[in-house]
UniProtKB/Swiss-Prot annotation:
Organism: Syntrophobacter fumaroxidans (strain DSM 10017 / MPOB)
Boundaries of every tr-type G domain copy: 10-278
Reported function: Increases the formation of ribosomal termination complexes and stimulates activities of RF-1 and RF-2. It binds guanine nucleotides and has strong preference for UGA stop codons. It may interact directly with the ribosome. The stimulation of RF-1 and RF-2 is significantly reduced by GTP and GDP, but not by GMP.
Record's keyword annotation contains GTP-binding: yes
Chain sites annotated for binding GTP: 19-26, 87-91, 141-144
Single GO molecular function: translation release factor activity, codon nonspecific
Localization (cell): Cytoplasm
Protein name (database record): Peptide chain release factor 3
Amino acid sequence: MNHRHRQEIDRRRTFGIISHPDAGKTTLTEKLLLFGGAIQLAGAVKARKASRHATSDWMAIERERGISVTTSVMKFNYRDFEINLLDTPGHQDFSEDTYRVLTAVDSALMVIDSAKGVEPQTEKLMEVCRMRNTPIITFINKLDREGQSPLALLGEIEDKLQIECTPLSWPIGSGKSFKGVYDLLGKKLHLFAPGQETRTNGGMVFDDLSDAALDELLGRQAVQLREDVELLEGAANPLEQEHYLRGNQTPVFFGSALNNFGVRELLDAFVQMAPPPHARPTVSREVSPYEDQFSGFVFKIQANMDPAHRDRIAFLRICSGKYTRGMKVIHHRAGREMNIANATIFLAQDRTNIDEAYPGDIIGIHNHGTIKIGDTFTEKEPLRFTGIPSFAPEHFRRVILKNPLKVKQLRKGLAQLTEEGAVQVFRPLAARDYILGAVGVLQFDVTVARLRTEYGVDADYEPAGYAAARWVESDSRNVMEEFEKENRGSLALDGEDRLTYLAPNEWRLGFVMEDWPRIRFRKSMECN
């Protein structure tokens, strides 16, 4: 591998942004793009009331509801670093998509609302990060609103998320008294003027906390800041890069994404601290990013990114080697060679064809129904990357088609939307229904809305009478045949034609599991 190739890998930073809904994640994403020069004007994100919408919220239903329901992938440069930012769904109903995205990143940025502290979705996502030892940087947001004290927030993060906190910036006041941020790394005090839409550089900067001008500007807050900084320098956990990289320590920054407070300090520290692409596990061995042969895996599929063309894009994380336009790769699950002629990079729905890409980069491949989540592509070696999950749904609805003549379009729409993995479709063995299964109920509204706008299918849904699903398998063909015969009315095939048991309640599921000890009831499956 030549020096330039190695340099390209080392300057890449691929990360996901995670948070509870409404913590300000999409706004922070916008501001990172703004400071990175990828956009010149940030969309004012005001949920349902906004007349404009965030760059990363591109699907019609996202604009309508003011939430992110799909993962956007955005690339930009900052201080000679190549950044791949994955803005994940914040709404809890879309957690499965977020879990998968976390398999494609090298680190994560966790956003916490200063008033609400650690919330349930944050705890769930933290669990996923912990399973993968993902390094996490924390941004405590909305300091321009009244909230908890910084020390209380740090204590709550340590208690609830079981991770050591190291503050690298410190706020001056909060709410109406919020004046700016002290950079504990650079030993600089930044006083900011609010600026929602453009990169504001008009704030004052102080290198010396003993400067008398501070007392005139801040009054009692200047004294408090000096006391806080003295306490932090003596008592706070020192930053230890190894602890951070192992996921045991989180550097913490404070600010207000909406008003650009603390965003530049966060980005400056992030590119220096966050890890470049690292080795990835496969079934047979670990793959280093510095290997010469190309390899990568698909962690997401998105239908209709361009509704005019009804296209489907497979999002592929490059793990080793280098992509070059027109290269031939092996699609291992399908057992065939394919040519990748028009790979794209993204800024939300905007796409650009590229000539080359490196480990850490996320590229889009046109998918005509043959690529699935979890698929591995390599130049030669038959590898299979591991750890991309699919979860049993917890909510179920029966599809009602209002125009029976549209059944073909319904079938096509459901097939393509289920490829994305956010909703699952089950076809009962004993009926001709389509049963939708999802991790959260909002997904049903999204599916019906997308069927209407993207496929011209007017459909609705009704309760399906199921409370749990489990994929079933057995080492004995005879046992499986007997199980199928006795439980045919409760069995269905999923989108991958895998046999699934649908239970009306948890009690019934437990009873059947106890009755059939030689059947495995799987709550999660690895994609491919």
